[in-house]
């Protein structure tokens, strides 16, 4: 039975993606989010299960993330300088994905070798997973979107599939992690077993993504006119200089950094909030289950919102919702129902940015071509990822710094007032401020309206130089 022709999108660009292609591509994000969710829970594991100092852990995380961010830039440079004729992106899904699954187990096997020895161990394992293996998989994977299809419509759908699949992965692991590890005994050995399960899942997801991905836009065995053209190789320093003079790329960089701070806070704050404000850390599983509702609604509604409002207005509406929800939560912070309700609205508010960061980055890459005559695909993605990595690291570290500032003691049975204020600070006040800043920045992103004319100009230049 022959497949139904895909046709062209509303801009007249040939479509090449079917459901199986979207699904296979999205498994890469599933693997990446499984890794990032694990890292987001490490503060709790290190402080409450291993007994390490919160301040030391917070500083360790931000040091690791800074190193991690710079390895993003290095990885982007490596990919952009891959010799012509070789695949740039797909091979890294296996080269990094399989070792990452193994290292995920080592994250929890912290030996009893003294405070300094433990800090050294967790620093090395965190750098290995996040700065080396996660980066070596994420940068090529993010770049695949640009070469897989020329259709802005399909890129948007890819972004939604990736965000939805990745978010589901994060939510599943966040919901299951505490109840399962508690059921397995609640000690370090229980977390090691859970890490082994997650590692196997990451390896399988990386294998599926590798098997289904392509570096050319193909459909039904036919190669469609979508491929990366050979372009002048620009020195790394010069490429970065050009990117920082692209205001749209800078906006994406900063907003991605800020949104990842919120993700980092959300992944780690819930367990502290449930344990010390509501008195039961198992409630984090309940919150995770409730959080699936706005997540599903977000992924269902983000497409119609983008179609109706466009990229920028969709983000502005979502950021306004997030800010409003956190303002209301300030006045109802000790009521579980309100925490769940306004937390759900905050969750909904983060979905559009998840879906659109790749689309906005691709738009800024198109602007690179318009302004400079070169796209710098991998370097653009890696430098944008730089912001995301620093953001998620800051999100995790902010929790530790707040707790360290008030002398957090995990052995107490009742939280002092200072500990509660610290939790309110990183769980409510910080996200509120970030939503306001993101609203202001995205309001300056006017590329969406002018991009079609820019693409026409690029096409004319290419025709003249042909």
Feature map (PLM): residue ranges:
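Membrane-embedded alpha-helical bundles of multi-pass transporters/translocases
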Residues: 2-466
């Amino acid at each position: 039975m022959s497949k139904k022709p895909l046709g062209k999108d509303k801009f007249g660009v040939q479509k090449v993606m079917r459901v199986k292609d979207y699904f296979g591509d999205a498994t890469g994000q599933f693997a990446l989010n499984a890794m990032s969710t694990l890292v987001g829970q490490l503060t709790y594991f290190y402080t409450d299960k291993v007994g390490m100092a919160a301040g030391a852990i917070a500083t360790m995380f931000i040091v690791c993330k800074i190193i991690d961010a710079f390895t993003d830039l290095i990885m982007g440079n490596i990919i952009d300088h891959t010799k012509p004729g070789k695949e740039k992106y797909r091979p890294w899904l296996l080269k990094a994905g399989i070792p990452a699954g193994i290292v995920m187990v080592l994250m929890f096997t912290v030996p009893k070798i003294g405070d300094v020895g433990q800090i050294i161990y967790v620093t090395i394992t965190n750098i290995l997973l996040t700065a080396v293996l996660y980066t070596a998989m994420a940068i090529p994977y993010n770049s695949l979107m640009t070469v897989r299809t020329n259709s802005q419509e399909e890129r948007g759908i890819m972004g939604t599939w990736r965000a939805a699949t990745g978010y589901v992965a994060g939510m599943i692991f966040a919901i299951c992690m505490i109840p399962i590890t508690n059921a397995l005994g609640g000690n370090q050995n229980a977390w090691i077993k859970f890490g082994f399960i997650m590692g196997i899942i990451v390896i399988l997801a990386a294998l599926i993504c590798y098997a289904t991905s392509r570096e050319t836009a193909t459909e039904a065995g036919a190669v469609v006119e979508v491929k990366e053209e050979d372009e002048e190789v620009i020195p790394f320093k010069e490429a970065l200089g050009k990117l920082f003079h692209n205001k749209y790329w800078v906006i994406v960089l900063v907003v991605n950094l800020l949104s990842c701070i919120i993700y980092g806070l959300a992944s780690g704050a819930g367990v502290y909030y449930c344990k010390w404000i509501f008195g039961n850390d198992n409630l984090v599983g309940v919150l995770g289950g409730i959080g699936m509702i706005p997540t599903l609604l977000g992924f269902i509604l983000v497409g119609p919102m983008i179609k109706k409002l466009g990229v920028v207005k969709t983000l502005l509406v979502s950021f306004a919702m997030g800010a409003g929800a956190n303002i209301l939560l300030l006045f109802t912070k000790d009521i579980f129902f309100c925490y769940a309700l306004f937390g759900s609205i905050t969750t909904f508010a983060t979905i559009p940015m998840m879906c659109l960061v790749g689309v906005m980055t691709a738009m800024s890459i198109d602007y690179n071509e318009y302004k400079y005559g070169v796209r710098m695909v991998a370097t653009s993605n890696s430098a944008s990822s730089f912001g995301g990595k620093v953001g998620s690291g800051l999100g995790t570290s902010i929790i530790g710094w707040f707790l360290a500032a008030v002398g957090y003691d995990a052995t107490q049975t009742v939280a002092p007032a200072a500990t509660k204020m610290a939790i309110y600070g990183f769980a409510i006040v910080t996200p509120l401020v970030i939503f306001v800043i993101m609203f202001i920045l995205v309001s300056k992103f006017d590329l969406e309206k002018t991009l079609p004319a820019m693409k026409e100009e690029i096409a004319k230049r290419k025709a003249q130089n042909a």
